[in-house]
Amino acid sequence: MKIKNSLKALKARHRDCQLVRRKGRVYIINKTAPRFKARQG
C-alpha cells in the first residue's frame, strides 16, 4: 500500500479505483487490481 499526501493522481491510475473514507482516513481501494491500494497521510 502506498502512503501519499494527495490521492488525486492515484485515483486516475486504474479505472476501478474507488475513493473511500474509513475511520477519518482516506483510502483508494481497487478490487480487481489490489496493487493500486493507497492511503492518505
From Swiss-Prot:
InterPro entries: Ribosomal_bL36 (IPR000473), Ribosomal_bL36_sp (IPR035977), Ribosomal_L36_bact (IPR047621)
Pfam family membership, one: Ribosomal_L36
UniProt keyword Ribosomal protein, yes or no: yes
GO molecular function term, any single one: structural constituent of ribosome
Presence of keyword Metal-binding: no
Keyword annotations of the record: Ribonucleoprotein, Ribosomal protein
Cellular component, GO annotation: ribonucleoprotein complex; ribosome
Superkingdom of origin organism: Bacteria
GO biological process: translation
NCBIfam families: PRK00831.1, rpmJ_bact
Alphabetical list of HAMAP family matching this protein: Ribosomal_bL36
Entry's family note: Belongs to the bacterial ribosomal protein bL36 family.
Identification of the protein by name: Large ribosomal subunit protein bL36
The species this protein was found in: Brucella canis (strain ATCC 23365 / NCTC 10854 / RM-666)
Lineage, opening ranks: Bacteria, Pseudomonadati, Pseudomonadota, Alphaproteobacteria, Hyphomicrobiales
GN (gene name): rpmJ
